[in-house]
Amino acid sequence: MLAGGSDGRVAVPLWLDPLSLTAPTDARALRTTDEAVRGIAAIMATRFRLPVPDRVMVHVYDGRRAFEQGLMRDARVSPVQASKLSNFAIGVGARGQVLLNDRPADRTQRERLRLIAHELTHVSQIELAGGEGRGEQWLAEGMAEWVAFATLERLGLDTLERRRQTAMAGLRSHATLLQHLDLEAHGTPQGFAAWHLREGSLPVYQLAFLIADDLIERRGLDAMRAYFASFKRSSGRRGNFDAAFGLSLDDFEAAALARLKTAAAL
Protein backbone atom coordinates (compact mmCIF):
# COMPACT_ATOMS: atom_id res chain seq x y z
CA MET A 1 0.00 0.00 0.00
CA LEU A 2 2.54 2.58 1.18
CA ALA A 3 6.20 2.42 2.05
CA GLY A 4 6.70 2.21 5.80
CA GLY A 5 8.53 4.77 7.90
CA SER A 6 11.24 3.98 10.41
CA ASP A 7 8.70 4.11 13.25
CA GLY A 8 6.21 1.85 11.48
CA ARG A 9 4.04 4.81 10.52
CA VAL A 10 3.27 6.65 7.30
CA ALA A 11 1.18 9.84 7.31
CA VAL A 12 -0.33 11.04 4.03
CA PRO A 13 -2.34 14.29 3.80
CA LEU A 14 -5.01 14.13 1.09
CA TRP A 15 -6.90 17.12 -0.24
CA LEU A 16 -10.38 16.11 -1.35
CA ASP A 17 -12.05 18.69 -3.57
CA PRO A 18 -15.67 17.47 -3.93
CA LEU A 19 -15.95 19.12 -7.36
CA SER A 20 -12.95 17.22 -8.71
CA LEU A 21 -13.72 13.82 -7.20
CA THR A 22 -14.77 11.18 -9.72
CA ALA A 23 -16.60 8.13 -8.39
CA PRO A 24 -14.98 4.93 -9.69
CA THR A 25 -16.88 1.81 -10.73
CA ASP A 26 -13.87 -0.50 -11.01
CA ALA A 27 -11.93 -1.58 -7.93
CA ARG A 28 -8.80 -2.01 -10.06
CA ALA A 29 -8.50 1.78 -10.07
CA LEU A 30 -8.05 1.76 -6.27
CA ARG A 31 -4.77 -0.08 -5.81
CA THR A 32 -3.00 2.40 -3.52
CA THR A 33 -4.22 3.90 -0.26
CA ASP A 34 -4.28 7.33 -1.90
CA GLU A 35 -6.44 6.06 -4.78
CA ALA A 36 -8.70 4.12 -2.42
CA VAL A 37 -9.38 7.06 -0.10
CA ARG A 38 -10.03 9.44 -2.99
CA GLY A 39 -12.21 6.98 -4.87
CA ILE A 40 -14.29 5.96 -1.86
CA ALA A 41 -14.68 9.59 -0.77
CA ALA A 42 -16.01 10.31 -4.27
CA ILE A 43 -18.54 7.47 -4.02
CA MET A 44 -19.66 8.69 -0.59
CA ALA A 45 -20.04 12.29 -1.77
CA THR A 46 -21.79 11.60 -5.08
CA ARG A 47 -23.79 8.44 -4.43
CA PHE A 48 -24.71 8.84 -0.76
CA ARG A 49 -24.38 12.64 -0.44
CA LEU A 50 -22.21 12.27 2.61
CA PRO A 51 -19.86 15.16 3.43
CA VAL A 52 -16.12 14.62 3.38
CA PRO A 53 -13.69 17.22 4.70
CA ASP A 54 -11.47 19.09 2.25
CA ARG A 55 -8.42 17.54 3.86
CA VAL A 56 -8.06 14.07 5.34
CA MET A 57 -4.90 12.86 7.02
CA VAL A 58 -4.40 9.13 6.47
CA HIS A 59 -2.12 7.32 8.92
CA VAL A 60 -0.98 3.79 8.06
CA TYR A 61 0.78 1.71 10.74
CA ASP A 62 2.87 -1.41 10.37
CA GLY A 63 1.37 -3.67 13.02
CA ARG A 64 -0.49 -3.54 16.32
CA ARG A 65 2.22 -1.85 18.40
CA ALA A 66 2.70 0.99 15.91
CA PHE A 67 -1.08 1.30 15.64
CA GLU A 68 -1.40 1.61 19.43
CA GLN A 69 1.28 4.30 19.52
CA GLY A 70 -0.44 6.10 16.64
CA LEU A 71 -3.77 6.13 18.42
CA MET A 72 -2.14 7.97 21.30
CA ARG A 73 0.05 10.31 19.23
CA ASP A 74 -2.14 11.06 16.22
CA ALA A 75 -5.70 10.57 17.54
CA ARG A 76 -5.01 11.75 21.11
CA VAL A 77 -6.51 8.56 22.56
CA SER A 78 -5.64 7.76 26.18
CA PRO A 79 -3.03 5.00 26.73
CA VAL A 80 -5.62 2.69 28.32
CA GLN A 81 -8.10 3.17 25.49
CA ALA A 82 -5.38 2.86 22.83
CA SER A 83 -4.29 -0.46 24.30
CA LYS A 84 -7.87 -1.76 24.25
CA LEU A 85 -8.59 -0.49 20.74
CA SER A 86 -5.40 -1.88 19.23
CA ASN A 87 -6.28 -5.35 20.51
CA PHE A 88 -9.35 -5.64 18.28
CA ALA A 89 -9.66 -2.64 15.94
CA ILE A 90 -7.88 -2.49 12.58
CA GLY A 91 -8.95 1.06 11.78
CA VAL A 92 -10.27 4.21 13.42
CA GLY A 93 -12.03 7.19 11.87
CA ALA A 94 -11.58 10.46 13.76
CA ARG A 95 -12.13 14.12 12.95
CA GLY A 96 -10.44 14.73 9.60
CA GLN A 97 -8.29 11.63 9.81
CA VAL A 98 -8.26 7.89 9.22
CA LEU A 99 -5.92 5.56 11.11
CA LEU A 100 -5.28 2.10 9.62
CA ASN A 101 -3.38 -0.95 10.86
CA ASP A 102 -1.69 -2.35 7.73
CA ARG A 103 -1.44 -5.86 9.17
CA PRO A 104 -2.04 -8.59 8.23
CA ALA A 105 -0.26 -7.86 4.96
CA ASP A 106 -2.32 -10.49 3.12
CA ARG A 107 -5.63 -8.69 3.75
CA THR A 108 -7.78 -8.95 0.63
CA GLN A 109 -8.48 -5.90 -1.50
CA ARG A 110 -12.17 -6.20 -0.71
CA GLU A 111 -11.51 -6.13 3.04
CA ARG A 112 -9.04 -3.25 2.67
CA LEU A 113 -11.59 -1.18 0.75
CA ARG A 114 -14.35 -2.11 3.21
CA LEU A 115 -12.20 -0.92 6.10
CA ILE A 116 -11.37 2.40 4.42
CA ALA A 117 -15.04 2.99 3.54
CA HIS A 118 -16.14 2.14 7.09
CA GLU A 119 -13.67 4.56 8.67
CA LEU A 120 -14.35 7.31 6.13
CA THR A 121 -18.03 7.02 7.02
CA HIS A 122 -17.11 7.79 10.63
CA VAL A 123 -15.17 10.83 9.40
CA SER A 124 -18.31 11.93 7.55
CA GLN A 125 -20.53 11.35 10.59
CA ILE A 126 -18.21 13.55 12.63
CA GLU A 127 -18.44 16.25 9.94
CA LEU A 128 -22.24 16.06 10.07
CA ALA A 129 -22.43 16.09 13.87
CA GLY A 130 -19.75 18.73 14.39
CA GLY A 131 -17.72 16.52 16.70
CA GLU A 132 -16.82 13.01 17.82
CA GLY A 133 -18.82 10.65 20.02
CA ARG A 134 -22.23 12.09 19.13
CA GLY A 135 -25.19 9.98 18.16
CA GLU A 136 -25.98 6.37 18.96
CA GLN A 137 -22.80 4.31 18.66
CA TRP A 138 -24.61 1.19 17.46
CA LEU A 139 -26.14 3.31 14.71
CA ALA A 140 -22.83 4.94 13.80
CA GLU A 141 -21.23 1.50 13.44
CA GLY A 142 -24.20 -0.02 11.63
CA MET A 143 -24.38 2.88 9.17
CA ALA A 144 -20.62 2.66 8.57
CA GLU A 145 -20.99 -1.02 7.69
CA TRP A 146 -23.97 -0.25 5.42
CA VAL A 147 -22.08 2.45 3.51
CA ALA A 148 -19.00 0.21 3.26
CA PHE A 149 -21.01 -2.69 1.82
CA ALA A 150 -22.91 -0.39 -0.55
CA THR A 151 -19.55 1.00 -1.70
CA LEU A 152 -18.27 -2.52 -2.39
CA GLU A 153 -21.46 -3.16 -4.34
CA ARG A 154 -20.79 -0.07 -6.43
CA LEU A 155 -17.30 -1.43 -7.17
CA GLY A 156 -18.62 -4.86 -8.12
CA LEU A 157 -16.94 -6.61 -5.18
CA ASP A 158 -19.97 -7.52 -3.06
CA THR A 159 -23.69 -6.90 -2.63
CA LEU A 160 -25.78 -5.58 0.23
CA GLU A 161 -28.10 -8.56 -0.12
CA ARG A 162 -25.27 -11.05 0.33
CA ARG A 163 -24.13 -9.16 3.41
CA ARG A 164 -27.68 -9.23 4.79
CA GLN A 165 -27.85 -12.98 4.33
CA THR A 166 -24.42 -13.47 5.90
CA ALA A 167 -25.33 -11.28 8.87
CA MET A 168 -28.64 -13.08 9.38
CA ALA A 169 -26.88 -16.44 9.31
CA GLY A 170 -24.49 -15.10 11.94
CA LEU A 171 -27.41 -14.04 14.14
CA ARG A 172 -28.87 -17.53 14.02
CA SER A 173 -25.61 -18.77 15.50
CA HIS A 174 -25.76 -16.11 18.25
CA ALA A 175 -29.45 -16.15 19.11
CA THR A 176 -28.82 -14.67 22.56
CA LEU A 177 -28.19 -11.31 20.87
CA LEU A 178 -31.89 -11.13 20.02
CA GLN A 179 -33.13 -11.75 23.53
CA HIS A 180 -32.89 -8.03 24.29
CA LEU A 181 -31.28 -5.33 22.15
CA ASP A 182 -30.97 -2.65 24.87
CA LEU A 183 -30.03 0.01 22.31
CA GLU A 184 -30.01 2.78 24.92
CA ALA A 185 -27.17 1.08 26.82
CA HIS A 186 -25.28 0.34 23.61
CA GLY A 187 -25.60 3.90 22.35
CA THR A 188 -22.48 5.24 24.04
CA PRO A 189 -18.96 4.39 22.80
CA GLN A 190 -18.22 2.70 26.13
CA GLY A 191 -21.47 0.73 26.09
CA PHE A 192 -20.97 -0.43 22.53
CA ALA A 193 -17.35 -1.44 23.19
CA ALA A 194 -18.39 -3.48 26.22
CA TRP A 195 -21.14 -5.12 24.14
CA HIS A 196 -18.92 -6.38 21.35
CA LEU A 197 -16.11 -7.37 23.72
CA ARG A 198 -18.66 -9.45 25.62
CA GLU A 199 -20.56 -10.96 22.69
CA GLY A 200 -17.89 -10.90 19.97
CA SER A 201 -17.09 -8.22 17.41
CA LEU A 202 -18.36 -10.03 14.31
CA PRO A 203 -21.90 -10.89 15.51
CA VAL A 204 -22.39 -7.48 17.16
CA TYR A 205 -21.28 -5.60 14.04
CA GLN A 206 -23.49 -7.84 11.92
CA LEU A 207 -26.43 -7.03 14.18
CA ALA A 208 -25.65 -3.30 14.10
CA PHE A 209 -25.58 -3.47 10.29
CA LEU A 210 -28.96 -5.23 10.16
CA ILE A 211 -30.55 -2.69 12.52
CA ALA A 212 -29.16 0.25 10.52
CA ASP A 213 -30.21 -1.44 7.27
CA ASP A 214 -33.75 -1.77 8.64
CA LEU A 215 -33.81 1.90 9.61
CA ILE A 216 -32.43 3.06 6.24
CA GLU A 217 -34.94 0.91 4.37
CA ARG A 218 -37.86 2.39 6.32
CA ARG A 219 -36.74 6.00 6.78
CA GLY A 220 -34.06 6.51 4.12
CA LEU A 221 -30.48 7.72 4.09
CA ASP A 222 -31.68 11.36 4.16
CA ALA A 223 -33.08 10.76 7.65
CA MET A 224 -29.79 9.17 8.70
CA ARG A 225 -27.85 12.23 7.54
CA ALA A 226 -30.35 14.52 9.27
CA TYR A 227 -30.00 12.53 12.49
CA PHE A 228 -26.24 13.02 12.74
CA ALA A 229 -26.48 16.65 11.61
CA SER A 230 -29.00 17.36 14.39
CA PHE A 231 -26.21 17.02 16.98
CA LYS A 232 -24.82 20.36 15.85
CA ARG A 233 -27.94 21.90 17.39
CA SER A 234 -28.75 19.58 20.28
CA SER A 235 -26.99 16.86 22.26
CA GLY A 236 -30.26 15.12 23.17
CA ARG A 237 -29.90 11.57 21.91
CA ARG A 238 -33.52 10.54 22.31
CA GLY A 239 -35.00 13.80 21.04
CA ASN A 240 -32.75 13.81 17.98
CA PHE A 241 -33.70 10.22 17.19
CA ASP A 242 -37.42 11.00 17.50
CA ALA A 243 -37.15 14.08 15.28
CA ALA A 244 -35.06 12.46 12.54
CA PHE A 245 -36.87 9.13 12.27
CA GLY A 246 -40.38 9.97 13.39
CA LEU A 247 -40.57 7.44 16.23
CA SER A 248 -39.03 6.91 19.63
CA LEU A 249 -35.94 4.79 20.18
CA ASP A 250 -37.99 2.42 22.35
CA ASP A 251 -40.66 1.96 19.66
CA PHE A 252 -38.06 1.41 16.95
CA GLU A 253 -36.19 -1.10 19.11
CA ALA A 254 -39.34 -3.13 19.77
CA ALA A 255 -40.35 -3.17 16.10
CA ALA A 256 -36.83 -3.91 14.83
CA LEU A 257 -36.40 -6.75 17.33
CA ALA A 258 -39.69 -8.32 16.24
CA ARG A 259 -38.71 -8.08 12.56
CA LEU A 260 -35.27 -9.55 13.20
CA LYS A 261 -36.70 -12.46 15.18
CA THR A 262 -39.17 -13.18 12.40
CA ALA A 263 -36.46 -13.00 9.72
CA ALA A 264 -34.19 -15.26 11.75
CA ALA A 265 -37.14 -17.55 12.58
CA LEU A 266 -36.30 -17.43 16.28
Predicted segment positions?
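Disordered inhibitory propeptide/activation segment of secreted metzincin zinc metalloprotease zymogens
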Residues: M1-A11
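Short, flexible segments with low predicted structural confidence
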Residues: L16, N87, W195-H196, A212-D213
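Acidic/His/Gly-enriched intrinsically disordered linker/tail segments
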Residues: G131-L210, E217-L266
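Juxtacatalytic substrate-recognition/specificity segment
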Residues: A11-E136, G236-R237
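Short, amphipathic alpha-helical segments that act as regulatory/interfacial helices
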Residues: A41, A45, F209-I216
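Compositionally biased, low-complexity repeat tracts
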Residues: G4, N87-V92, W138, L183, ...
